[in-house]
């Protein structure tokens, strides 16, 4: 506990996006964001950075 419902949902979505990036390295960041439940790439990037400390493209490039 100790986190808001929206933070919980975003954390779940970010974990799914990380799984998708690992499983489908040729998928675009936009596609990963949409498939993870984000309607905006900027919202996805902001949530991803908040949860992981890095932006999606850096995460992908450092895997």
What do these predicted ranges mean?
Residues 35-36, 49, 58:
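Short, surface-exposed, polar/charged, turn-prone segments marking secondary-structure boundaries
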Residues 43-44, 48:
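Short hydrophobic/aromatic patch on the recognition helix
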Residues 1-39, 62-63:
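Terminal helix-turn-helix DNA-binding modules in bacterial transcription factors
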Residues 50-51, 62:
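Alpha-helical DNA-recognition elements
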Residues 41-42, 57:
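Key DNA-contact positions within bacterial/archaeal DNA-binding proteins
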